[in-house]
Amino acid sequence: MLFAQLVILVIIVMLFLCRFANKLRGLPPGPTPWPFIGNTFQVPEDRIDLIINEFKKKYGGIFTLWLPFPTIVICDYDMLKRNIVKNGESFSGRPDTFIMDMLVQGNYGLFFMENNWWKAQRRFTTHIFRSLGVGQAGTQDTIASLASGLVEKIDGQKDKPIELRPLLVHVVGNVIHKHLFGFTREWNETEILDFHVAINDVLEHFTSPKTQLLDAWPWLAYLDKPLSLGIPRTTRANDAIIQNLEQALAKHKTGINYDEEPSSYMDAFLKEMKIRAAENALEDGFTEKQLIVAIYDLYSAGMETIIIVLRFAFLYLVNNPETQKRIHEELDRNVGRERQVVMDDQKHLPYTCAFLQEVYRLGYVLPVNFLRCTLTDVEDCEGYRLNAGTRVIAQFQSVHVDKKHFPDPEHFNPDRFLNSRGEYIRDDRVNPFSMGKRSCLGENLARMEVFLYFCTLMQNFEWHTDGPYAPPIDVITSSLRAPKPFTVRASRR
């Protein structure tokens, strides 16, 4: 009897502590967490962006989720600017997570690394990308060549139903492949497609709140099947990627000429390794393991997100046929059909730019942004004190569907980004590439690919639904948010 009373008392105390957990710790309000698991099962992975938007309506632009550690969600535009941008250094950390340690066995890469040499690695990558002309004229030529091949492939379909995804995998994947390895792959080679399949297997459960339970309770990995954590599938795909990159590195090392200017990221990194080894100065992480994981990061980031945006673009296009007519007229009037579109044409294509910005707004790829953590104590985060190491989600996606900024936010309307004179308005409230110190390294490249591939396909084809009705705008949400598979038809203009 006494034991039962003690159990009941413990449960009552725990529920009381959970009920007032945020207030007791001086954290922003939020839904009441459950003992041990927090709010994990209140934010299902396939609806996490929608649930966060509902919590925003209830608790405001900053609130706390326990996943299972207390995690501060910032989802108001002005709050994001004040904290993630203006105080970016304090919010630029990455927490140690079970999933990253499982995937790369240490603190490596560019996007999820958190150690003393992260800044040096990011600076080096930015410098090499600039010297290689990433996102500049040379890249434009590469995209133009790949786009011509894409047009030929679609031409060969002869008005048959097309699933754009495998075609886009080849051309988009080849752009980052050229910068990383120094060459492009042919249509009959499968390496890029194999990587694409594997990275999607890795990402399927990458940001799942259930996976974050493993940060607190690693032994839950043994309950993979009942919890649907997907660990065996994730590790198999990850191991295949690492093995393939190791083989590519070994092959690359046999042919590199250290006396020549680097023609790829791998060349540049290996050359830097050699220089630093000669000077006995490897403290900034210039190792083969770092090179492999950095290429892993850049390859995956420079591929699937761009493919998803382009798929969203054509999904919204066939669902809004009046937009296609206006884009065709604008292209014909300002570019014509005799030459390829170039980046300088943007200033003459305001409606096309507005259309793509509306795609970025409604077709956001990350349902929830990757975890950050505070590197220092933050004395005033919207009236709350955050200790160093506090987990933070900068949920800029919520701004995209905020009525305060975008009236009728669920409606696809490119005209919202045109002024009264029909001029395009670049709106920094639409932020598909993150913000602050952890913003996307390849934003310029991604925007270039989306613009040039989209405009080339619009310049050459009329796009039609495959059947009497347009495909529904349905999404599949895991670590990424993408349209469900759909087909369209293309006819030569």
UniProtKB/Swiss-Prot annotation:
GO terms for biological process: organic acid metabolic process; xenobiotic metabolic process. Keywords: Heme, Iron, Membrane, Metal-binding, Monooxygenase, Oxidoreductase, Transmembrane, Transmembrane helix. Its cofactor is heme. PROSITE patterns: CYTOCHROME_P450 (PS00086). GO terms for cellular component: cytoplasm; intracellular membrane-bounded organelle; membrane. It holds the Pfam family p450. GO terms for molecular function: heme binding; iron ion binding; oxidoreductase activity, acting on paired donors, with incorporation or reduction of molecular oxygen, reduced flavin or flavoprotein as one donor, and incorporation of one atom of oxygen. The chain crosses the membrane at residues 1-21, 60-80, 290-310. It comes from the Eukaryota. Its main location: membrane. It is a multi-pass membrane protein. Belongs to the cytochrome P450 family. InterPro entries: Cyt_P450, Cyt_P450_CS, Cyt_P450_E_grp-I, Cyt_P450_sf, Cytochrome_P450_fam2. Cytochromes P450 are a group of heme-thiolate monooxygenases. They oxidize a variety of structurally unrelated compounds, including steroids, fatty acids, and xenobiotics. Its EC number is 1.14.-.-. Heme binds at residue 440. The keyword Ion transport does not apply. It comes from Caenorhabditis elegans. The gene is cyp-36A1. This is Probable cytochrome P450 CYP36A1. It is found in: Membrane.
